[in-house]
């Protein structure tokens, strides 16, 4: 049994991606009530509500004894909770339960993609500290991307992601790869400046993006470093492999096609101005400044070699 918490708050959206959110809540609360003496279930009706609730928890207007917060949802909802906790300097740990199309960071936490199994796993999970990115004042747990990764997400949004789920990503990937939009960039990583032209650029904290693992052995969201990847726009094969999620790819061995630079402080400007995807939400534009906040967040993590 995991540690006993005094008062946990479980946040959820009605449109979380689960087939039946209320049935899902019933399954999840079975596990969470064994971890918390008191469990509050809080609906987030509008974007930004979770951040407001976190502010109320910080000011002890919600309750004076909250010592853990849970989220049932996809990466965008997780991102909102991360911002709520860090922006309000709320010194409480987080438990994440997958409930969206992609749940990249729950893979990093060794959690099952099934919400019911994942909530069961939380009972035997332990707290670990994770790095967080701060991007123009917004907190980001997993990745920052621009170029093809934004185009792909927008092509999905034009379709019916809510109905087709992951299937919608396949058609949009083909559409995206056939029409890449190039841009000029100036990227500074610590003291190193790079200039060039590309169709995709990614800065990763976590090792999983878009439903699959970045094939780079030493990528960790606990090492105090961020990893920038610049993709050669001419290398269609590599881009195709990246989007088709071929697990056999090893980016460590690729010298032509992907530039990889690790560092702690990043600035990025582009021409033209580009939209920026943060953890699946397209909410920023270039120029951006990114810094790593080492071990900024405590998150429940399932033991790596434990039985799923």
UniProtKB/Swiss-Prot annotation:
UniProt entry keywords in alphabetical sequence: ATP-binding, Kinase, Lipid biosynthesis, Lipid metabolism, Magnesium, Metal-binding, Nucleotide-binding, Phospholipid biosynthesis, Phospholipid metabolism, Transferase
Lineage of the organism: Bacteria, Bacillati, Bacillota, Bacilli, Bacillales
InterPro entries per the UniProt record, alphabetical: ATP-NAD_kinase_N, Diacylglycerol/lipid_kinase, Diacylglycerol_kinase_cat_dom, Lipid_Phosphate_FormReg, NAD/diacylglycerol_kinase_sf, YegS/DAGK_C
Gene3D superfamilies: 2.60.200.40, Probable inorganic polyphosphate/atp-NAD kinase, domain 1
Family: Belongs to the diacylglycerol/lipid kinase family.
Residue sites binding ATP per the record: 44, 74-80, 101
Cofactor binding summary note: Binds 1 Mg(2+) ion per subunit. This ion appears to have a structural role and is required for catalytic activity.
Species for this entry: Staphylococcus haemolyticus (strain JCSC1435)
UniProt domain DAGKc: residue ranges: 1-139
Function: May catalyze the ATP-dependent phosphorylation of lipids other than diacylglycerol (DAG).
Gene Ontology CC terms: plasma membrane
Enzyme Commission no: 2.7.1.-
GO biological process: phospholipid biosynthetic process
Single annotated GO MF: metal ion binding
Parts forming coiled coils: none
PANTHER family assigned: LIPID KINASE YEGS (PTHR12358:SF106), SPHINGOSINE KINASE (PTHR12358)
Keyword Transferase belongs to the record: yes
Protein name listed in UniProt: Putative lipid kinase SH2167
Enzyme class: transferase
Cofactor(s), names only, from the UniProt record: Mg(2+)
């Amino acid at each position: 049994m995991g540690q006993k918490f005094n008062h946990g708050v479980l946040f959820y959206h009605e449109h979380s991606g689960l087939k039946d959110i209320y049935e899902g809540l019933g399954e999840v609360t079975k596990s969470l009530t064994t971890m918390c003496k008191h469990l509050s279930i809080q609906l987030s009706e509008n974007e930004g509500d979770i951040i407001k609730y976190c502010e109320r928890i910080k000011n002890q207007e919600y309750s004076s004894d909250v010592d853990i917060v849970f989220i049932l949802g996809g990466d965008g909802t997780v991102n909102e909770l991360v911002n709520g906790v860090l922006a309000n300097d709320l010194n409480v740990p987080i438990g994440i339960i997958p409930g969206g199309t992609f749940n990249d960071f729950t893979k990093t936490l060794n959690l099952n993609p099934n919400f019911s199994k994942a909530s069961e796993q939380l009972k035997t999970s332990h707290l670990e500290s994770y790095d967080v990115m701060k991007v123009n004042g917004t907190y980001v747990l997993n990745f920052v991307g621009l170029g093809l990764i934004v185009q792909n997400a927008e092509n999905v949004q034009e379709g019916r992601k809510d109905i087709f789920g992951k299937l919608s990503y396949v058609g949009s990937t083909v559409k995206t790869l056939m029409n890449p939009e190039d841009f000029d960039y100036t990227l500074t990583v610590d003291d190193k400046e790079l200039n060039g032209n590309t169709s995709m650029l990614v800065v990763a904290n976590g090792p999983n993006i878009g439903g699959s693992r970045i094939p780079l052995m030493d990528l960790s969201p606990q090492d105090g470093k961020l990893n920038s990847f610049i993709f050669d726009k001419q290398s269609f094969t590599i881009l195709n492999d990246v989007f088709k999620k071929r697990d056999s790819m090893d980016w460590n061995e690729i010298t032509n096609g992907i530039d990889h630079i690790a560092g702690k402080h990043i600035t990025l400007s582009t021409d033209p101005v580009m939209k920026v995807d943060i953890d699946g939400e397209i909410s920023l534009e270039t120029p951006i400044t990114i810094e790593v906040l080492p071990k900024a967040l405590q998150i429940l993590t399932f033991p790596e070699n434990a039985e799923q």
